Amino acid sequence: MDIKYVSTRGDKEKVTASQAILSGIAPDGGLYVPETFPKLDKSLEELKGLNYREIAYEVMKLFLTDFTKEELKACIDSAYDSKFDTEEIVPMKEADGLTYLELFHGPTLAFKDMALSILPYLMVTSAKKNNLKEKIIILTATSGDTGKAALTGFADVEGTGIIVFYPKDGVSPFQRQQMVTEKGKNTSVVAIEGNFDDAQNGVKAIFSDKELAAELKEKGYVFSSANSINIGRLVPQIVYYVYAYVKMIEEGKLNLGDLLDVCVPTGNFGNILAASFAKELGLPLGKLICASNTNKVLFDFFKTGTYDRDREFTLTISPSMDILISSNLERLIYRLCDCDAAKNAKFMSELVNEGRYTIDRTMAGKLTDFEAGFATEEDTLNTIKEVFDKTGYVIDTHTAVAAFVANEYRNKNTSHNKILIASTASPFKFAGSVLTALEYDKVDGFTSEWDKIRELERISGKKLPETARDIENAKVIHKDICAKDEMKALVKEKILK
């Protein structure tokens, strides 16, 4: 089946996968979605025994239909190699009745590596397929993890440049150090005075500026995105849910056809949307449990049908989820509207102009695949300690949000489905908060982030990977700070300097 992509907001033009990857976002500001949805063309039985790269090919070929077999396999083999610290790519661990899918074994210790390791190869291949002559400028907003993963993926990739914006006070010390020490000659990192939503809105505004796009194209540049608004980010994330299910069958933890519930710590809605797409492919997933922190805009949406961004924004110990405008939810809303782009566009307009929208009863009735919960800061810290005390397994703050919500769901329901937790980051990325959970009386004695990491190594018996250890004494290269309304001018300056 030849899959074409359409905008969630009604742009009539149908584009290929490679064109959608290059554009990042549709000309009308919508997000690209498959016009028709494929199904797995191999049975789960046939997928048994395949490694991660092989399953990645079987899943991604269904969506990226204008890539040849050779092109797609080359992208996959280049992405999922020795830069991951385990041959499995995504190992699974059992702890206290839950199965943790460890998505943090890539170079930047976060799940974003799963997609951002392959996106540069997909993009360069797409550029060749479409005879693109211009240099691709990747614009990315980050709440912490996407930034470094994108920088690592695109560093010194020929024909590309990348500019990352992050909230000055909204990332962990480790995340900041990862970004500001990036050595790639085609990279720029900028702190903005604002939160992640300000950074994301600024990037979207730049993408939507047709005058700026025309000016830069004339000078040989085009924009694209490494955020999960890019379909090239979303498709690789579907893979690990299929892989996890197949491995659980192989290990006797599931019988073929058993429903598997999935609980995902959620900010921008991309990771859980990928699980939804996996279910649509035919994977036997049960409930998709959306886990929020105290910025619980998604929890409230699933409970009330109203998405309301007009609320207090809180900086939490799970900063990658500190988001009030969850971009990928638009792709779900579009499907709830029966792909009525005009209806979806109206909701998105209401969100911009009024700060909220409410879906109708028919749409709300289609949300039965989803459950939602949230964890307070206290819940998050207590969960880290409880899991460690019971099992010796250390989880990070975002994963702890999901574990708390999964346990809450399990205790309230009679379902006997196994629950898979998307474990999205290494605990070393948030060592201070994890230590606070494990050793209340000692954490204040460690003045540097690296002392905290060494203490966490001692407690957990795990070692920080060498690739991450290198940044401790690395030189800070990127020192730019700008106001949120200065982003466009700064982008022009950096590109045309």
Predicted feature descriptions by range:
Residues M1-K497:
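PLP-dependent amino-acid enzyme catalytic core
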